[in-house]
From Swiss-Prot:
Disulfide bonds: none annotated. Participates in both the initiation and recycling phases of transcription. In the presence of the delta subunit, RNAP displays an increased specificity of transcription, a decreased affinity for nucleic acids, and an increased efficiency of RNA synthesis because of enhanced recycling. The keyword Transferase applies. The gene is rpoE. GO terms for cellular component: DNA-directed RNA polymerase complex. InterPro entries: Asxl_HARE-HTH, RNAP_delta_N_dom_sf, RpoE. PROSITE patterns: HTH_HARE. This is Probable DNA-directed RNA polymerase subunit delta. Keywords: DNA-directed RNA polymerase, Nucleotidyltransferase, Transcription, Transferase. GO terms for biological process: DNA-templated transcription; regulation of DNA-templated transcription. Belongs to the RpoE family.
């Protein structure tokens, strides 16, 4: 493969991006190339080894994306931006996508949960099983009067728990409580609280 643009130049001095531009210009419009085919054509022209191409590939791909003269056309196809007018660029990309897909894409149907009479609408009113008990007719709840026997059993259970901690034998039944403590008065309490 010979490129007229580079006639008389050393191939070792050429960059991959220059060669890519020349290859695409020679092919002409509507002859976009897949990235892999473009890299293979560059490798053949520059007579570089696979190892050299693999090493330069990330830099070449970055240059291809940042150089303003190339345009990605979808599915890793590349062309020259000069082939397309500004208004034509979006149309060309859309056309390629439609041609490749074959069938137009279907839009998903949006569901409005508040629509009445729509069979597909989601009814959120019956989602929570806890709400089922509230949907039934409210029954009058009758509260029993306090049963004195219940109170006695509660007191006995508290007493038994206290006895487990402090047995009855250890309790001093003759504790005298002096309601008036000579060492402490209400006036001192007020002063400390302030």
């Amino acid at each position: 493969m010979e490129l007229e643009v580079f006639a008389g130049q050393e191939k070792s001095e050429l960059s991959m991006i220059e060669v890519a531009r020349a290859i695409l210009e020679e092919r002409g419009r509507d002859k976009e190339m897949y990235f892999s085919d473009l890299v293979n054509a560059i490798q053949v022209y520059l007579e570089k080894s696979d190892a050299d191409i693999r090493e330069a590939l990330p830099f070449f791909y970055s240059d291809l994306n940042t150089d303003g003269s190339f345009i990605p056309l979808g599915e890793n196809k590349w062309g020259l931006r000069s082939w397309y007018g500004i208004d034509e660029i979006d149309e060309e990309i859309v056309t390629l996508e439609e041609d490749e897909d074959g069938a137009p894409k279907h839009k998903r149907k949006r569901v409005n949960a508040f629509m009445d009479g729509d069979e597909d609408a989601i009814d959120y009113s019956d989602d929570d099983p806890e709400d089922e008990s509230f949907n039934t007719a409210e029954e009058d709840t009758e509260y029993d009067e306090e049963d004195p026997d219940d109170e006695k059993s509660e007191v006995e259970s508290y007493d038994s728990e206290i006895n487990e901690i402090i047995p009855d034998e250890d309790l001093d039944e003759n504790v005298d409580l002096d309601e008036e403590d000579d060492d402490y008065s209400d006036d001192e309490e007020d002063e400390e609280g302030e």
